[in-house]
């Protein structure tokens, strides 16, 4: 492993800033720590609130991530309070948390790491703790002690697995005291502890320790067949994609029975090689690489026995059977190891391995599903490396359970922001590059939805998606070119949604076009163009959505953005009004057909939404002004004055109506028409 340390950069930094710097260097190495794992510390002397010099431990706070950690993420704990505990023999978890809260230098500061006492009990000023893949590879095999002796000799000491907390902190301190010549300590099936007189020394010790492990692994793996070789042939990319498209919605529906999840698909070479191997059915069911992975991946993945299955329907049935088996076994695992106050979480898997196809991962959002995927990649690496030395081993089931349901570990998950109204939902919005569609996409995303933005203007759709991800986070939106008049283009857009997020919950069918002319002078191509976009387009999009929602089996919402003209057509606006009337009838039929499947279909009728609108082109403005006998400059004010409230209708107003119909606030509403027109009496629904 290459050291990332730069004296040029480090020489400018003070003690605490140096700790932040080193922590980020460690966090940048994903083979050392992943997604909030690991911690670092530095013992300093600071002045307290009375100006007295006080020995303080600055340690990473619980839930913060080393790769992006800041000064504020290192709460200070008084060392005299920490060292006073060396005389204790036992201390409960909650007692430890409460004690450390009273020992904080900064009142109301971040909660210190659950491994704070471990850092404090080590005498050296600087301490680094990682969950390095290379080290865990050496300890997670049945020859671990022999392997460690061969790689490190007497330089490094090893400690058998213990759950983080007071007991392991005491044991680490005692073990280091008994071996003063040791340069590092390895926690079996957990990670590393290195130390030094300075942050640089502790960092260098970590890099040197890992490098020796990596060299040993590379030497041991040379010429060896990994995972026993193939058991199932890896299918061709096109076939894997087709099977993923068939499996993902059904899998997402099954995993979302209690709470919806986002599902991602990974058919990268490391994943398919592992999932399709001879060893995978066995080694995948041994356990996690490190205990902290369990809060994301659970103890085990769901392995689907797909050796003899050729088509999507047979594979789907096998996945369903594997999920039922996983649920039974997970529930039994919980009952066998539960402790007082432990509450059964979702008993379904976060990782599903399908030989020959790839891996599906599930999470509360795209980011979390990605974390699960990333962690399992590391697990695959560890299994492969450890198996080169002997039989892969992991935590016993009871130890894994105690971490998976440990309140101090679960605390990290409580630091996430509260879920919003549309959290865990997937929406597809057509015509999302501008105007109403853009406003709806942004509004749904603001309420937590993952949004696929489709538009014939692909670049505009991408811009909308980038606006969304800039506001709410990476992975929350996808922009793509989508022509709603093209069956192939519509199908490709829905496939993109499935591959990105696993399925669909909300369709907002909004794309439209307008042409104004008297019937007598209208060209056939203009009439047909209006029906292609404003009628056929909604049919193609809705048909694909209903197929997908039905496959998922968890209901959904269809929201059609129609127009006031459905109820009150306008002079010289026949092509638009007639096509939009067809759209509205389609929506009502879908309310009838979708109800048995929990699929709701509703309509929004806006009027005269000019802002950011491509529908109201200069030609259409000119044509509509002529039809009303007014100047073009008077058009917007004319429409405002004709509604009862005399208000201008904005895209954001329509977005609020779409949000209502897309959300559970309207869970008992279908076949409804909601007007957003300021009150046009001719367009009253009843």
Descriptions of predicted regions:
Residues 547, 592-593, 667:
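Alpha-helical segment proximal to the catalytic Tyr-Lys
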Residues 1-427, 439:
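Glycine-rich flexible loops
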Residues 518-519, 526-528, 621, 639:
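Substrate-binding pocket helix/loop in short-chain dehydrogenase/reductase
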Residues 542, 579-582, 587:
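Active-site helix of classical SDR
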Residues 658, 670-686:
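Short C-terminal tail/terminal secondary-structure segment
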